[in-house]
């Protein structure tokens, strides 16, 4: 029998895929199931890690959304996950999956929004990844809890 993802919804799918998964590492305080993971290390600081995927045609339409605004949004949706866990975002990694229709100038415009968000929230861009794709953009943000 085939179950459509829509029948479970996002959280139902996450619950189904992660059922029975238990952390093996002592440093993993809270894993799957909230806005961000919580990692704890001997320094007594905890690390929050989150990932948000923004996909064209699902989360935004470039007909209506300027790239600079999309860049800003892609950063702050990750920051909000960290704030939701009572943390403060410090770093972000940016991963992009792009089709050939995007130019370098387009990506500079996208990054201008990411940079603006990072400046306003005092967050460092520390790395990321790029890949070819049809339409997808992906952003990941790790952060220490204050």
Question: Model regions: which residues?
Answer:
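Extreme N-terminal cap/leader segments of soluble proteins
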Residues: 1-66, 85, 94, 117
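A broad detector of the eukaryotic-type serine/threonine protein kinase catalytic domain
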Residues: 58, 97-98, 145
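A glycine-rich phosphate/pyrophosphate-binding beta-strand-loop-alpha-helix module
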Residues: 65-138
């Amino acid at each position: 029998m085939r179950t459509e993802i829509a029948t479970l919804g996002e959280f139902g799918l996450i619950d189904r895929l992660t059922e029975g998964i238990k952390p093996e590492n002592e440093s993993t305080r809270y894993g799957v199931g909230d806005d961000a993971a919580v990692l704890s290390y001997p320094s007594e600081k905890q690390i929050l890690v989150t990932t948000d995927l923004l996909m064209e045609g699902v989360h935004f339409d470039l007909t209506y959304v300027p790239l600079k605004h999309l860049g800003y949004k892609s950063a702050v949706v990750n920051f909000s996950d960290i704030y939701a866990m009572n943390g403060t975002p410090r770093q972000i990694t940016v991963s992009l999956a792009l089709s050939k229709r995007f130019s370098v100038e387009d990506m500079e415009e996208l990054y201008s929004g990411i940079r603006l968000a990072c400046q306003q929230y005092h967050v460092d861009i520390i790395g990321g990844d790029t890949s070819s794709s049809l339409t997808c953009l992906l952003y990941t943000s790790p952060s220490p809890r204050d």
